[in-house]
Amino acid sequence: MNFPVLKGAGYVLVHTPDMIMHNGTTQTTEKIVNPESEYLKKLPEHLRSFEDVVAYAPNQTYIGSMTPEALGEIAMPWWTEDKKVAGADRYGKLGEIMPQDEFLALMSASDVFDLVLFEKEFIEGAKAKLAAHPVVGNLAESVNAGVELAEIEKQLSEFHAEGLYNNGKLVGCVKRAHDVDVNLNSHTMLENLAVKASGVLALANLIAKNNVNPAEVDYIIECSEEACGDMNQRGGGNFAKALAEMTGCVNATGSDMRGFCAGPTHALIAAAALVKSGVYKNVIIAAGGATAKLGMNGKDHVKKEMPILEDCLGGFAVLVSENDGVNPILRTDLVGRHTVATGSAPQAVIGSLVLSPLKAGGLKITDVDKYSVEMQNPDITKPAGAGDVPEANYKMIAALAVMGKEIERADIAAFVEKHGMVGWAPTQGHIPSGVPYIGFAISDLTEGSVNRTMIVGKGSLFLGRMTNLFDGVSIVAERNTGKVESGSSVSTEEIRKMIAESMKDFAAHLLAE
């Protein structure tokens, strides 16, 4: 069977410290219910510099400059001064970390309806920095001209615009796109322009770092957790086409796929199916980050005298292509899914996502070398009381292996060590869900000693208040054997002709009798 392959991946982080206070929902909610809170007063003292963000080991892992194994060798917590990565660079093997001023310029470049305004002096400097960028420098030409600060202040005070800040100062705004449509108000437009711009950055990095010809991309599936539309269709879309337009994918179309945190794995399976079926040759899944989740666990971090670690937007892009005999294959016949009948018990959930597809392929849990689950950074989640999320997932998988008599109970810790990884991804919902390992998996399954991995995505659908059901899907990726079908199989049209000729011969035979 000719399976599709994982051809390349790109990962980006965008340091947005000012958006924590002004756009993260933990902070914006606090401003409403308790505007004089000690938390809001102390928060600015707990913001990290761009240099500290770049030198943070989990961030270096996210962009491919450090392996998960190397990160796991560093004792936690990772945020302390003595754990900074010496000589850390903003550019990595798999992507990059972008500073806030460059990103604000990229947001302006992503604006095609003249909704983003910036103060003249600020945007001139930010535009110059963006123009020097090795991957998206060409987009600086699309940055809007600056205006006087008074015009921005007027938009905020009279027309309900949303402010954009840098180093604590007002430098711009996002205007509303409609006078009364809440789906096009300034708050929504800011969120959507941020997810678009960070998605563009991720897609551009995928293209640049994997020598992808954007003109050969057929289809893009955008799988973030935002929605764009208007009052008549608030989730109508389409981020995917918007990303394609900005990254030179002139022959691509696309659509948006949603599933909360499980969205990226749903998109990965859909991309694999589209390529496997022959509908498209090259399909990209991509997503930008969520401003709402910035500083989500900030109260706990400040309470424990930590820096605010949720200070970056995340983004990623993955290319799925036809079998090239080299890159890892996606086993479209080994797909796990949490069905309506599965239920929400942890054992049932993990069983449906891990055990069921492996059994279908005659495999054991221990036959998978590495599992990529919810790869949240425990530096963020443990102080907030959420524990080590990846480790908890691995222990549940190990427990299933114990129940299946594949390992002994005493071997659970060893299983977690061998088949698991420490978490390194930001808590941006869809961003840490399964996909952060794909960039490493491509290397591990081609140049390394890994032969089989499983990408697992899980989602909490109850957040949308439409169902109490849980969700999740998974897919196995394997080392490529190098065998590629020649494509000499008989086509449907040829089969029809053969049947017609056989029927004709049969009819002639009957007439002869």
From Swiss-Prot:
InterPro entries per the UniProt record, alphabetical: ACP_syn_III_N, DUF5940, Gly/sarc/bet/_Rdtase_C_bsu, Thiolase-like
UniProt-recorded Gene Ontology molecular function terms: 3-oxoacyl-[acyl-carrier-protein] synthase activity; betaine reductase activity; glycine reductase activity; sarcosine reductase activity
Keywords in alphabetical order: Oxidoreductase
Reactions catalysed according to its record: acetyl phosphate + [thioredoxin]-disulfide + NH4(+) + H2O = [thioredoxin]-dithiol + glycine + phosphate + H(+); acetyl phosphate + methylamine + [thioredoxin]-disulfide + H2O = sarcosine + [thioredoxin]-dithiol + phosphate + H(+); acetyl phosphate + trimethylamine + [thioredoxin]-disulfide + H2O = glycine betaine + [thioredoxin]-dithiol + phosphate + H(+)
EC number from the UniProt entry: 1.21.4.2, 1.21.4.3, 1.21.4.4
Range of residues in the leader sequence: none
EC main group: oxidoreductase
GO terms classed as biological process: fatty acid biosynthetic process
Subunit structure: Heterooctamer of four alpha and four beta subunits. Component of the glycine, sarcosine and betaine reductase complexes, together with proteins A and B.
Protein role: In the first step of glycine, betaine and sarcosine reductases, the substrate is bound to component PB via a Schiff base intermediate. Then the PB-activated substrate is nucleophilically attacked by the selenol anion of component PA to transform it to a carboxymethylated selenoether and the respective amine. By action of component PC, acetyl phosphate is formed, leaving component PA in its oxidized state. Finally component PA becomes reduced by the thioredoxin system to start a new catalytic cycle of reductive deamination.
Protein name: Glycine/sarcosine/betaine reductase complex component C subunit beta
Record organism: Peptoclostridium acidaminophilum (Eubacterium acidaminophilum)
Classification of source organism: Bacteria, Bacillati, Bacillota, Clostridia, Peptostreptococcales
Gene that this polypeptide is encoded by: grdC
